[in-house]
Structures are given as structure tokens and as C-alpha cells.
């Protein structure tokens, strides 16, 4: 499944309705995971946009980013969409404020030579796409539209 970098803020912060891109982070403290894609994206943006200036604050893990966001020590977090969705469930009070602005594909690693296993995994994935299971699971667990439970239930009824 695909993902990408997003921006998250504290739900009740003054930035909850104003930050939509890294350009909007001018003058703010931006949390990223040390050495990760979030750091590379935030730093590259600064390098390519000299008119924008924000302080990059690096953390050993994304939990530290979110913890300091909620504590008010940083203003915004750059994180992977899927990772942030999980963290937002565990640490209430954060809000994703934009769609992914990078593209990242996720994969399942299979040991070289395990062709039967690879074929089985690919067949399962194809089946999930074909019968609507993938879309229902995405909506139920990832999509924040608020209609996740209803869409997943409809897909289950169709599959039965």
C-alpha cells in the first residue's frame, strides 16, 4: 500500500487550521525522526526554499516527536501517513493537516528463491484488491473520513 509524508499538529493549536504545507511552517519548530525520510524531506525543502526558515528538531523515534508536539515543545511533526495514523490513535490530540506531499510505496520482503511464497502473497494481494477487501480495510483502519465502519461493514456483507 502507498503512503507518504504528512504534517501533524496539536489539535487545539493555533496552527491547526493554518498549516497545509512546509511553507506554512516558517518560523516554527518542526519535529522529525533522526536520519529518516522526514528529516530528509524537511531539510531538502529548506535547501530548495531559501525564503522559508524553520527549526528542525530531531528525535530518535516518532513517539518522541508526537510527545513533544503534545507537550508544546515543537509546533509541527513531519511523519509518514500510516505511522502518524497509528500514533494519532495512541496519542490523542494530534491532527493531520494535509494530504501526503511525497509518495512512498510499502512492500513485503520475500527471500530470494522463495517463488512459491512470492506468488502466494501476490495472489492474496490481488484477491484483496479485486473483492474490495483492500478498500474496506483502508477505509476502516486508515482513512479518517469517518465512514470507515460503514464501508467495511458493506464490504463484509458483499463478501458473504
Model-derived features: positions:
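Beta->alpha turn/N-cap motifs
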Residues: 10-11, 33-36, 61-62, 77-85
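Surface-exposed, polar/charged faces of alpha-helical domains
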Residues: 13, 20, 51-54, 71, ...
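Short beta-strand->loop
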Residues: 25-35, 59, 111
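Alpha-helical elements of the RecA-like P-loop NTPase motor core of helicases
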Residues: 39-40, 66-67, 85-86, 119, ...
Amino acid at each position: 500500500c502507498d503512503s507518504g509524508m504528512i504534517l501533524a499538529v496539536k489539535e487545539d493549536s493555533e496552527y491547526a487550521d493554518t498549516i497545509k504545507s512546509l511553507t506554512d511552517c516558517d518560523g516554527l519548530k518542526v519535529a522529525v525522526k533522526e536520519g529518516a525520510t522526514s528529516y530528509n524531506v524537511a531539510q531538502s525543502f529548506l535547501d530548495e526554499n531559501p525564503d522559508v526558515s524553520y527549526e528542525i528538531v530531531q528525535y530518535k523515534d516518532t513517539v518522541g516527536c508526537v510527545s513533544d508536539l503534545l507537550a508544546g515543545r515543537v509546533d509541527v511533526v513531519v511523519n509518514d501517513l500510516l505511522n502518524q495514523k497509528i500514533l494519532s490513535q495512541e496519542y490523542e490530540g494530534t491532527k493531520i493537516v494535509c494530504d501526503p506531499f511525497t509518495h512512498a510505496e510499502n512492500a513485503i520482503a520475500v527471500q530470494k528463491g522463495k517463488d512459491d511464497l512470492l506468488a502466494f502473497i501476490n495472489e492474496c494481494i490481488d484477491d484483496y484488491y479485486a473483492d474490495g477487501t483492500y478498500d474496506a480495510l483502508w477505509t476502516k483502519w486508515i482513512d479518517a473520513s469517518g465512514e470507515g465502519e460503514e464501508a467495511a461493514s458493506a464490504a463484509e456483507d458483499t463478501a458473504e
